[in-house]
């Protein structure tokens, strides 16, 4: 074969190409590696971790959604790397699960403990609070969060509600008040009008915060009781 013919064979062969979507996942892995680098300042590592999460949200909104549309339309043409939309989705399912597992591992096994060593405690359970702090958290929920929570039940007469992109939502099993009927599924959107980070007044040099979704989870029975 001539040089030009060899170049044409390489250009037309899928084995010489990487799928665009899988390449993006590899890019997010490289960003995540920055969050895992112990030589980088702690808050910079947290920033890199948050970037990977934000990237993943946008990736699903645009690229994964586009692949799903093509699959639903019966589109079977292969991309330059030789993969159909369905094959790409299957490969992404594996690759993204690995990425998310690594995200959680980085946060829970490394960054979270470093935050605590530096005096920043992220509260996830009511039992982690002192009596005084618990009173503050309960009051904050009743005065600021509860008024803007709206549980939306899902049943045969009420289809699954439209979930906004990048919104935080909680799934809950609810039952009508004073009823023995079966539990029903409901969604509760975490209010976007409030700060996601709630600082808890505490004594000493430590700083305690609770995320709005965790605060809502702790009190989730309150808005669902009257249903």
Task: Annotate the PLM regions.
Residues 30, 50-54, 58, 62, ...:
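Short, residue-level hotspots on alpha-helical faces of the histone-fold
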Residues 117, 125-126, 133-136, 159-161, ...:
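Aromatic-residue-lined binding/catalytic grooves and analogous aromatic/hydrophobic interfacial grooves
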Residues 19-24, 44, 52, 81-88, ...:
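Secondary-structure capping and boundary motifs in well-ordered enzyme cores
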Residues 55-56, 130-133, 179-180, 195-196:
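Flexible loop/turn segments at secondary-structure boundaries
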Residues 13-56:
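N-terminal-proximal low-complexity accessory segments that begin disordered
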Residues 1-10, 218-227:
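Single conserved hydrophobic/aromatic residue that forms the stacking wall/gate
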Residues 20, 141-217, 221, 225:
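His/Asp/Glu-rich acidic catalytic environments and adjacent acidic regulatory segments
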Residues 36-39, 49-125, 130:
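Extended, charge-enriched "interface" segments that sit outside catalytic cores
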């Amino acid at each position: 074969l001539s040089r030009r013919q060899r170049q044409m064979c390489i250009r037309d062969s899928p084995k010489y190409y990487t799928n665009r979507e899988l390449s993006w996942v590899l890019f997010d892995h490289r960003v995540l590696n920055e969050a895992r680098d112990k030589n980088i300042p702690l808050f910079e590592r947290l920033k890199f971790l948050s970037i990977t999460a934000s990237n993943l949200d946008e990736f699903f909104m645009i690229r994964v959604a586009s692949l799903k549309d093509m699959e639903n339309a019966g589109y079977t043409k292969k991309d330059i790397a030789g993969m159909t939309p369905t094959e790409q989705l299957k490969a992404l399912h594996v690759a993204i699960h690995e990425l998310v597992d690594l995200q959680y591992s980085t946060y829970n096994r490394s960054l979270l403990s470093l935050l605590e060593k530096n005096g920043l405690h992220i509260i996830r359970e009511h039992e982690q609070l002192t009596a005084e702090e618990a009173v503050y958290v309960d009051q904050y929920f009743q005065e600021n969060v509860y008024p803007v929570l709206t549980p939306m039940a899902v049943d045969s007469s009420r289809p699954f509600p439209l979930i906004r992109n990048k919104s935080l939502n909680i799934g809950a099993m609810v039952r009508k008040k004073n009823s023995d009927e079966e539990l029903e599924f409901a969604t509760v959107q975490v209010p976007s009008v409030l700060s996601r980070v709630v600082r808890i007044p505490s004594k000493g040099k430590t700083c305690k915060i609770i995320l709005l979704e965790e605060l809502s989870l702790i009190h989730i029975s309150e808005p669902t009781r009257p249903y």
